[in-house]
Amino acid sequence: MQFVLSWVFLVGILKGVQCEVQLVESGGGLVQPRGSLRLSCAASGFTVSSNEMSWIRQAPGKGLEWVSSISGGSTYYADSRKGRFTISRDNSKNTLYLQMNNLRAEGTAVYYCARY
């Protein structure tokens, strides 16, 4: 059985500022159960390292669910993701990552990166 991890891109405009904030995600796809994927979220218009960044997901027919966050040197995970998911960032590329290992069919969802 295979399942799909989808991705989208989110675009936001800062109110009253002529600066576009953009998050462009990539890396989703079809994967076998127990397989691995790495999602990427390239940011522009702000600095990833200066903000709390998170990954959230939405499974089919379900609401939004927090997955993981990174702030400064600290990382946080939903209990169900600990040990399987790793959030990280590359400051030189201004990019956020989510490494997902030992994926399960119930992991099928749209994954979003978000800035807080």
From Swiss-Prot:
Gene3D superfamilies from the UniProt entry: Immunoglobulins
Highest taxon above the source species: Eukaryota
Region (Complementarity-determining-2), start-end ranges: 70-75
A Gene Ontology biological process term: immunoglobulin mediated immune response
Swiss-Prot/TrEMBL keywords: Adaptive immunity, Cell membrane, Disulfide bond, Immunity, Immunoglobulin, Immunoglobulin domain, Membrane, Secreted, Signal
Ranges for region Framework-1: 20-44
Chain intervals for the UniProt region annotation (Framework-2): 53-69
Gene Ontology MF terms: antigen binding
Residue segments, region Framework-3: 76-113
GO CC aspect terms: extracellular region; immunoglobulin complex; plasma membrane
Region (Complementarity-determining-1): 45-52
Disulphide connectivity of cysteines: C41-C113
Cellular location(s): Secreted; Cell membrane
Chain intervals for the UniProt region annotation (Complementarity-determining-3): 114-116
All residue ranges annotated as the Ig-like domain in the record: 36-116
Quaternary structure, from the entry: Immunoglobulins are composed of two identical heavy chains and two identical light chains; disulfide-linked.
Cross-referenced PANTHER family: IMMUNOGLOBULIN HEAVY CHAIN
Protein name: Probable non-functional immunoglobulin heavy variable 3-38
